[in-house]
Amino acid sequence: MTNKANPSSSKEAVLDAAELFFAVRGYTAVTLKHIADKLGIKQASLYYHFPLGKEDLYVEVMLRHLEHRRISLERLMSRAEPTLESYLLEVGVWLIQQPPLNGGRMIMSDLPELSSEKAAQLEAAIYRCAFAPIEALFIHYRHELKDRFQNDPGFIGGTFLSSLESLYTVRKYGSKTDQELVIDLIELLLRGAHSG
């Protein structure tokens, strides 16, 4: 008979449990005890996989999460019709169905608590995996934007992403479908709310 390792103590199980906590609560509000309790293991067991502790666990969790997001965004964009609105709709519906990244909280609260090296690593990953794919859409389709936005595709891309994070909450209290919410956001972003 072979001895099987406790599946809840495997590195993947630790990463999965930690991701649930860090995504919702952020770095500072989560303790290693929260994660260990969720897994039904002793807190000291977490140091087997993450000898440097909470910061290393957080960084690995978030890098994995961001990379998954980047791969998913690329997959979604590869199957959308090649128009700005189709890309934004495909990506937008998917994003509001995911737990929000809470990029603002990460940048304002989580990253300052990390070592400067780890913070820079995560900040670069946030840009590369979450922001750059959307910014690239607006760069590619800048000719469809009003003149004043053509030279700042990052602003309009960031506005789209920030608005989507808000829609994650709005969708819980309204009667519109996810697709209707994203269509309205795209309309508002690309053409504005002004009727005149």
Predicted regions mapped to residue ranges:
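Hydrophobic alpha-helical connector segments
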Residues: 60, 74-101, 153-160
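Amphipathic alpha-helical packing segments from all-alpha helical-bundle domains
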Residues: 70, 74, 101, 117-144, ...
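Solvent-exposed, amphipathic alpha-helical segments
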Residues: 17-24, 71-76, 159, 163-170
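Short, basic, alpha-helical segments at the C-terminal edge of helix-turn-helix-like DNA-binding modules
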Residues: 62-68
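C-terminal peripheral helix-coil segments that are non-catalytic and often amphipathic
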Residues: 132-143, 147-150, 158-196
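Short alpha-helical functional segments enriched in proximate histidine and acidic residues
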Residues: 21, 68, 98, 133, ...
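Helix-turn-helix
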Residues: 2, 9, 13, 17, ...
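Amphipathic alpha-helical segments used for helix-helix packing
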Residues: 86-90, 96-121, 135, 169-172
